[in-house]
Amino acid sequence: MNQYVIAIDQGTTSTRAIIFDHSGAIVSSGQMEHEQIFPKAGWVEHDAAEIWNNTREVIASALSKANLTRHDIAAVGITNQRETAVVWDKTTGEPVYNAIVWQDTRTQDIVDELSKDGGGDRFKQKVGLPLATYFSGTKIKWILDNVDGAREKAEAGNLVFGNTDCWVLWNLTGGVDGGVHVTDVTNASRTLFMDLETLQWDEEILGIFGVPRSMMPEIKSSSEVYGTVHTSQLLRETPVAGILGDQQAATFGQAAFETGEAKNTYGTGCFLIFNTGEEIVHSKNGLLTTVGYKLGDAKPHYALEGSIAVTGSLIQWLRDNLGMISSAPEVETLAASVKDNGGVYIVPAFSGLFAPYWRPDARGAIVGLTRFVNKNHIARAALESTAFQTREVLDAVNADSGVPLTELKVDGGMVANDALMQFQADILGVPVIRPKVIETTALGAAYAAGLAVGFWKDLGELSSNWSEDKRWEPQLDQAEQERQMRLWRKAVTKSMDWVDEDVK
């Protein structure tokens, strides 16, 4: 009995439930994609009701495949796409608008307006983040300002906000029938509203945004029992005991618990997190300061993060928008058929540029095209753009920390691509290491939940679960490395200053 932990991984493109055993191995999983809604250029939405329905389906699927019941599950952990904002009516359980996704850029006017008084970094010392469309705060304000009746309902105390962790937890624990309205410190640190030192909502910033305090969930640690699954659900009476935003969860799943350890997750975007321990480090090089994790009553661990908006989604774009490939894995075959990129560089600034530039005026660019270039070169350039962007973030981490990283742990869907991982090692000049369990995001959430209920006893036990699967050593000489980075940086400059009054 109680031999397993289940993690709900509510991601940007799909929702998964993964069951882990005590060794951290995957026992079974269920997965369902949800619709990507693009009402206008720059707008990205999800149907929150669809996400909740899918969550129930994937839990059932994972249990069924392993022939398990709720009696076999010690705890539930939740991990999620961060920043994606859901606002719902707590009396009906209905969202007042679609979830506005982290990639969405519709709130640029709000960012510009708020930046007039004190600049884009006016809140950064307190919350660790620049003013940007990326974070939840501007999305909540947009919903209150633009959805009929939303502000009135919010001020009457009927509307609540949560990222998708909070939305799933609220529904899982009963919804309108006593659902728990809680988030953890890692998700709260991505709203623009949480004070990094007090780990509480900042009343002054909420006031500036015009967001009622009553909308905000209670902030708790990443590893404690928040409540139990409602009696109407398959996992009824199972404790929900861990929540981590997806990138922090991946860091935790990689057992990067010590100061100076880092990981890079390759998914829809790329996210490099560098553990700074109990110290809050403010970046001078375009990185975010965020909460890494907090276990129960222990002190929080902080991190520097380099967030890259578009990596894996560039491959989706080649497939879905251009029809250049019919499945994502094809891109590796095409890329491997040419010896280099043919002089082509792709800067996938579909939503502007995130770290380390923070340039919302940038848009996607393909540069260096000649008659010689074919689709194989384009495929290679698409993969290489992920590695180039990661190198720029790693350079920023090294500059901020003063201690150059000697290796990079990697995870996420794209790390199955050997060609990309080799090029990543080449362009970084340090070894790249893939663990045996690459589902580190879900594993991190499972670990947080399991620790809270005593399924695992301490971090040492989790560290002993980690094992290396493959390592890529750099094979490119430094002169060629720097030549390619010089051309990449030149390409990046070509993507900037595109958006103005004529081009939105």
Swiss-Prot record:
Q: Which reaction does it catalyse?
A: glycerol + ATP = sn-glycerol 3-phosphate + ADP + H(+)
Q: Which GO terms describe its biological process?
A: glycerol catabolic process; glycerol metabolic process; glycerol-3-phosphate metabolic process
GO CC term (a single one): cytosol
Give GO MF terms, alphabetically.
Answer: ATP binding; glycerol kinase activity
- Keywords for this entry? ATP-binding, Glycerol metabolism, Kinase, Nucleotide-binding, Transferase
Residues at which glycerol binds: R82, E83, Y134, D246, Q247
Task: Give the top-rank taxon of the lineage listed in the UniProt record for this protein.
Answer: Bacteria
Task: Tell me the HAMAP family matching this sequence.
Answer: Glycerol_kin
Q: What is this protein identified as?
A: Glycerol kinase
